[in-house]
Curated annotation (Swiss-Prot):
The lineage of its organism: Eukaryota, Metazoa, Chordata, Craniata, Vertebrata. This is Alpha-1,3-galactosyltransferase 2. Binds 1 Mn(2+) ion per subunit. Its cofactor is Mn(2+). The gene is A3galt2. One of its GO terms (biological process) is lipid glycosylation. CDD domains: Glyco_transf_6 (cd02515).
Amino acid sequence: MALEGLRAKKRLLWRLFLSAFGLLGLYHYWFKIFRLFEVFIPMGICPMAIMPLLKDNFTGVLRHWARPEVLTCTSWGAPIIWDETFDPHVAEREARRQNLTIGLTVFAVGRYLEKYLEHFLVSAEQYFMVGQNVVYYVFTDRPEAVPHVALGQGRLLRVKPVRREKRWQDVSMARMLTLHEALGGQLGREADYVFCLDVDQYFSGNFGPEVLADLVAQLHAWHFRWPRWMLPYERDKRSAAALSLSEGDFYYHAAVFGGSVAALLKLTAHCATGQQLDREHGIEARWHDESHLNKFFWLSKPTKLLSPEFCWAEEIGWRPEIHHPRLIWAPKEYALVRT
């Protein structure tokens, strides 16, 4: 009798295992199928009535009609920058006329430094704000290991030491507080606009003054066509980053965001405060600082959005609307860099 009961339990466990394995396979199969057909999900169209009213500080009147197949503006009147909708030469001249200095921050902690930093900086020298005044801020736990990269005229690199955290999640979440302190200090005094980027990516095309605005958000390459109910916002109501099913506009990528010093001080303060509140309540948002970033952009709308061309993942595959990727995700070797 006991033996028969044991066999029954084993059969039940095997059935549960096979069912779980089957559901997992179905999920992955469905996800791949969904990826093939998501190109047919409509993005919406910028209303013709507001197109002439959409002007950019650096490129003048934008050519939204040049890209009728994609969404080129938001419901609150912010432009979404796609290839062919702007004149890069106009933007470059305007930035030089204003004699701007653009800051570029990047965190290279632990093995991220040797794996990604040199390629990031070399490609930035080739494509990021070419001909403009640029100051790089590299935050790292090993300042002595930062590679030497030849810099062009009017371009500086500053290395800022940071503490290495025990978990990679803590590195991600400490970023907002570190950026807030830097923006309130030397970085805020010497830069007019600042862009904050992840290090595990590299520039592949011109990333110029056409991206500048008071508050800039990056559409996430994996989610820019998804309906709102599918977007991976924080749903735990206890978290300061939580958004309800009726909230949210787009899903923004924390690998790229930027703006004026004043606007970024508000952004980083909001995110750092939200993370601290979550920590005090023993909560950790699903996507860490990115979850808090999305909450901030829901409450404080960005004044310019960058299309996925400005931060693209090649593993997604070919997409007809992606003409010229400007920034590419490097291969993610988490097993190597997060240990």
